[in-house]
Amino acid sequence: DLVVGTGGYVSGPILRKAAQLGIKTVSHESNAFPGVTTKLLSRYVDEILLAVPEAKKYLDPKCKEVVVGNPVRESIVYADRQKAREKLAVGDKICIVSFGGSQGAHRLNQAMADLMAWHTKKGSEFEGKIHHIHATGKYGVEDFPQMLREKGANFEQNPNVDIREYINDMDDCLAAADLVICRAGASTLSELEAAGRASILIPSPNVAENHQYHNGMVLVNNNAAVLIEEKNLTGESLCKAVEELVSQPQKLLS
């Protein structure tokens, strides 16, 4: 009765054939910049379901599109902020949550080591005022502590530094966070929006059609995020962006 695709290459010929057979067809596009398959299918399927309205301009003008967003887990939407902060021992500190995906991202880990060295430095303005949860990913779990040591970060036995391989309790971490630093995948951004969290986005350049950049710019253009392209990412640029936000709490709330 209905064939649903989600924009991957394999869904193209299946949805096209279903349309030829007169079966109702729907394709969902999770990114702000539609992929090749979605663009082609927009001529044939009954409806294109979009995550954001900004994607409309790339589709066939005659197609029928509906903006529905991306699916988000209920636990993200309904997580209790106070309980999450108590569980994670954040207290009244500014909570930063950062991650680069399950495999990790070397450039992000390098910049995050600089950031931790900056806010844990003895005598610095933010020493003891920031609780930082960082997921290194699979390939950073062994290297990251050494990066911190080389940069002079005060992290060992520091209750305000929580280093993990992976974040398994993302609902609690997002609920507790004041600022999130991460990539700009469609699902991640949908969770940030659902949780209402300010973010610094560092889109992966290694994705089809640079779609993470386009995803991130949707939030930037709605004053919901700051974006740093990976080619411009340094410890200095990240620390500057974080300092501007945490020094003006109203920016984190707006």
Label the predicted regions.
Residues 2, 167, 171-189, 197-198:
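Acidic donor-binding loop of glycosyltransferase active sites
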Residues 2-21:
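An aromatic- and histidine-rich active-site surface loop
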Residues 7-8, 101, 137, 185, ...:
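Short glycine-/small-residue-rich Rossmann-like dinucleotide-binding loops
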Residues 18-82:
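Active-site-proximal region of nucleotide-activated glycan assembly enzymes
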Residues 19, 42, 174, 192-193, ...:
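Short alpha-helix at the nucleotide-sugar/activated-sugar donor binding site of glycosyltransferases
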Residues 81-83, 89-179, 213-217, 221, ...:
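Donor-nucleotide binding loops and adjacent catalytic segments primarily
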Residues 226, 231-254:
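Conserved donor-nucleotide binding/catalytic region of nucleotide-linked donor-dependent transferases
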